[in-house]
Amino acid sequence: MVSSVLRDARRIVVKVGSSLVTNEGRGLDEVAIGEWCRQLAALVRGQGGEPREVIMVSSGAIAEGMKRLGWSSRPGEIHELQAAAAVGQMGLAQMYETKLREQSMGSAQVLLTHADLADRERYLNARSTLLTLLRLGVVPVINENDTVVTDEIKFGDNDTLGALVANLVEADALVILTDQKGLYTADPRRDPQAQFVHEAQAGDAALEAMAGGAGSSIGKGGMITKILAAKRAAGSGASTVIAWGREPDVLLRLARGESIGTLLVAQTQKNQARKQWMVDHLQLRGSVTVDAGAAAKLREDGKSLLPIGMVAVEGDFVRGDVIAVRDPGGTEIARGLANYASAEARLLCRKPSAEFERLLGYAAEPEMVHRDNMVVLGAR
């Protein structure tokens, strides 16, 4: 299964934890980060296969900030943790930029919070930015914006953020690099009978028991959060691999189809998962009616919806809201995320994209709903 899941993945999110990035808190591990960046660059260029799109989610800002500030122990005050994050993020971003530049690869820093992905408009903006960076061949390096959040520092984790990013960009796979070789049936440090888990279904409830539960020593060490992250990633059709981050050429070997670490398989196909999410779980905020030609293009060709094909707009919605697309007879044929608010959409009906800047005062996306953010209902 690993051979097909990772070998065939074209968009991959890689998450690496702070213990690896900072060499157990001793400072940024320049050699390790350089190795991961070398592998990321090789994947983007298609070394040994097809080019991949890769996003790195990296912890380590707080740990690096503590080192730079001369703090030997993690402070308990939130504002001190936030200060450490602000100091450390400078070094973290600089290190990735330097190591990727050594590979002649562009990089971009993106700081996110859970709130950014909970708000539909900010979600859509973040998605558009990341997809543009990937299209440009740039490696986005994402971290949680610890300087402005509170609960995430106290209880959150970048395993969850990695899964949310996988959802956001519709990744094919999530790779979590950790200081453990993968998942065991019990804590191998305490139970000599513990068996290594090579593969399981991401939604298997028994996995959480294997990880020890949230209150166990292993759970506090992070394995439980990785199991939950894999379950979340599976919701959008992405399978997850948990592997030792210091395994030589771990990313390249996974991409070649080698069996390394634990594979947690998503039971839902990526497109099916997105359809279910779009159709069943998001509330409609309005609708647009299109002419017969636009309806045919959506139904038959899966094209994006352009405003020139719209004849009417109903409801009051904002950018990022879910809207229905109706044919001239009023039948709902698709739904998706709106690139324009309802007031703007009314101005754009029957207009070509060349007129958008004159009408709106700014130039934005040429589509009302991009095909990547749309589900054609007849194709369910």
From Swiss-Prot:
Catalysed transformations (reactions): L-glutamate + ATP = L-glutamyl 5-phosphate + ADP
One annotated GO biological process: L-proline biosynthetic process
Residues involved in ATP binding: 15, 178-179
EC number per UniProt: 2.7.2.11
Entries under HAMAP family matching the protein: ProB (MF_00456)
Family designation: Belongs to the glutamate 5-kinase family.
The protein's name in its UniProt record: Glutamate 5-kinase
